[in-house]
Amino acid sequence: MTNTYTSLVKQTFHFPQEDFDLNDDGYLEFNGLDIKALIDKYGTPLKLSYLPKIGMQINRAKKMFETAFKKHKYEGSYNYCYCTKSSHFSFVVEEALKNNIHLETSYAYDIEIINQLYKRKKINKDIFIVCNGFKQRSYTSRIARLINTGFTNVVPILDNKDELQMYKRSVKHPFKLGIRVAAEEEPTFPFYTSRLGIRPKDILEFYVDEIEGYENKFQLKMLHIFLNKGIKDDIYYWSELNKIINLYCQLKKICPELDSINIGGGFPIKHSLGFEYDYQFMINEIVGNIKKACKKAKVPMPNIFTEFGSFTVGESMAHIYSVVGEKIQNDRERWYMIDSSFITTLPDTWGIGERFLMLPINKWENEYQRVVLGGMTCDSHDYYDSEEHINEVFLPKIENENNSSDSTAKTEPLYVGFFHTGAYQDQISGYGGIKHCLIPSPKHVIVDYDKNGKLTDWMYAREQSAQSMLKILGYL
C-alpha cells in the first residue's frame, strides 16, 4: 500500500529525524521516548515535559555563539538569559539554571521566584537578573530590594523616562541600568512603534540629562531591543538591529560604562518536519555586524546578551490527545473530535493562529485522509485545520477498522500529538482554574534523568477535578 500515512510523511519530508522516529511496533517516538508506553500508563489528554531538551537547546546556542566569536575574533562575552515568562515552572527554570545561564523577568512576582531560587541555593547573588517590562511600584520596589540585599548584577531595563526616579529613591547601593530601545514595528503590524521602551531619538538626551554625572550611584550598562517578529534574515530585522548597534556606538563615546547590547530573543523553533533555519548563519551575521560597526566607530565591542524563551523550553513539551469520535458533516468536511480543547490547552492555536508540529502516535500504516480536528468545547472556533507547511490536516483513517482482523485496530483509538508546545501555552491558558465549558486541565507528566542517569517519569499534576472548579465558583 503506497497511500499510507507513513508514505505521505516520507514523500513530503526527510523522515525519520533526530527527535522523531517510529519504533519497531510502529508507534511514534519523541526524543527517543516511547509515547505509547506513557499513554498506556497515564492515559490522555496528557501534557508531557521532557526536561533534558532544555539543556540541549541552551548548550546548542552557547556553542553557536562561541563558534561565531571565534570566527570573527570577537572581543566581548556572551550571556544566555532565560525568559521566565515562557514557562515559570520550577522544574523548567531549575533545569535551565543547571547550564550556567542568567534570568530575565517581566513582572513583580518574577522577583519572588528569584528569592525562592536563592533560598533553594539554585542561584547566587552574582547572577544577571535582567528586569524588563513597564513597571509599577510593586515591581520596582522588589527590584530595589534585590539590589539592596546584595544582588550585584540586577539590571533594571528602563521602559520609560520616569522609571529611573523610582530607583533613585529606593536603591541604597550603586547599581546597573539598561535602556530598552523602542523598536519600529514591521509594516504589517497595527502600530508603527512598539509601546515598550524609550524612543531612540530621546535616549542620548535622556542619558546626558538624567544619568551622566551620577556614575557613583548608577551606571548605564546595557542597551536592549526586542523585535516581535523574531530573529529573521530580512531587511526589517537587520535595519532594526543596526539602529541599536549604531546607537550603542554613539553612546559609548560619551558613556564609557556602557558595555552590553541585549538583542532579546526570537529564535524560531521547529513547528514542522520541514522546518529549516540556519541558526549558525544568523548568529555569525549578528556578531559580524556588531563587530563591523564598532570597528568603524572605533569603540570597544559590547558583551552580547540574548533572552531565549521559546527556544529554551518550547521543544521540550508535547500535548497528546485521543480521537474519541468521527463526524461527517457534509461531503467535504470530516471531523476528528479530541478528548480536550484547543482553546483551553493550546490557546495560541485559537488566539494567534499558531501552528504546532502535529503527528499521530499510531496507525501510521493506515491510509490517510484530510480531516479537521475539533475540540470538546461548544465554541465554533475550537478547531485545528491547517499545518505549518500546508493549509490542511492529514491523519490516518479510522473508519472501517471494526471490519479489520487486527484486534488492536478495533480497540485502540487514534492518538494525536502536538509537539514543541512548551512555551507560553500554560501561561496564557492558566494552570488549573476555570476553563471554557469547564474543560479540565490535562494531567501533566515530567520525564527526566534521575541521579543514576536513568530516564524516569512521574506525574506532576493530575487531571483537574470537578471539585476544584466548583470550589472556585463558590459551589463548595
Description of each model-found segment:
Residues 1-138, 370-372, 391-427, 432, ...:
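N-terminal capping/small domains of soluble enzymes
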Residues 54, 85, 107, 179, ...:
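Conserved, mostly hydrophobic/aromatic
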Residues 68-75, 206-220, 250-257, 285-302, ...:
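A structural motif corresponding to the C-terminal end of an alpha-helix
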Residues 78-260, 269:
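Active-site-proximal beta-alpha core segment in soluble small-molecule metabolic enzymes
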Residues 227-228, 261-271, 306-311:
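Glycine-rich beta-strand-to-loop/alpha-helix junction loops that act as flexible
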Residues 232-239, 270-282, 313-325, 430:
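Short glycine/threonine-rich loop-to-helix capping motif typified by GTGT followed
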Residues 238-261, 272-303, 328:
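Catalytic cores of soluble, metal-dependent hydrolases
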